[in-house]
C-alpha cells in the first residue's frame, strides 16, 4: 500500500505512467488494503506541479470527480492553488458504476486515483476492457498459473504496451526490453516505443532493393 501511494505521488503525479485506476477485490481483505492505502496516501505531500496551468487542470479534474455521485472519497483534502503543490485525491467506486461512466475513464493528470472494487475476475476484465488502451497494466497476485491468471494476463497484454507483475509502473528503464507505448489512446503508434533501444524504429522505414547490383548488396545495409 505504501509503495503504491508513493508511486501515485512521485513527481506530484506528473509521470505519464502514474497509477490512476486500482482494481481491488470487494471483500474483507480488499477493505483492509484500501484502508491502509488511503492512510499511506493521506500522509504524503506531493511537491509543486510544473506550472499553474497544470495545477489548475488537476483541480478541475478532481472537482469533476468530487461531483460524481458514484464516488466515495477516501482522501479528499484541498490545498491553496497559489502554492502549486496539490493534495492527493483518492476515491472508491464499484465496478458497475465505473464501467457505466465514461467520465470516470478520463485521466486526472496528477496525484489522483480511483479504487475500483471488483467482485470477480470477470468484473476485473470488464473494467480493463472499458478503460481501453493504456501505457501499463500491473498485475498483483499472479505468481501461480491458473485459468484466472491466464485470462488476466491475456486482457492485460491486449490493453497495455507494458505489463508489470507485483510492481509499480512509474519507473521506465531505458533498456532493450522496454515498451513505452500502447493501444490507442495511450499511443498513436502502438507498434513502436518512445523509450528503450527500439525507439529509433520510430524514425526508420523499410526499403526493398530489388535486383540490386553486387556492389550494393555487399554494403549490407550501410547507407550510400
Question: What function would you assign to each model-found segment?
Answer:
Residues 81-84, 121-219:
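C-terminal core of ALDH-fold dehydrogenases
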Residues 1-27, 31, 72:
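Conserved NAD(P)+-binding/catalytic subdomain of aldehyde/semialdehyde dehydrogenases
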Residues 13-16, 106-108, 157:
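Solvent-exposed alpha-helices and their adjacent loops that cap or buttress functional pockets
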Residues 19, 110, 184-188:
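Short beta-alpha connecting loops at secondary-structure transitions
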Residues 1-6, 10, 34-37, 152, ...:
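Catalytic cores of nucleotide-enabled group-transfer and carboxylate-activating enzymes in metabolic
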Residues 24-139:
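NAD(P)-dependent aldehyde/semialdehyde dehydrogenase
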Residues 12-15, 19, 46-56, 72-77, ...:
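Flexible, glycine/charged-enriched surface loops at secondary-structure junctions
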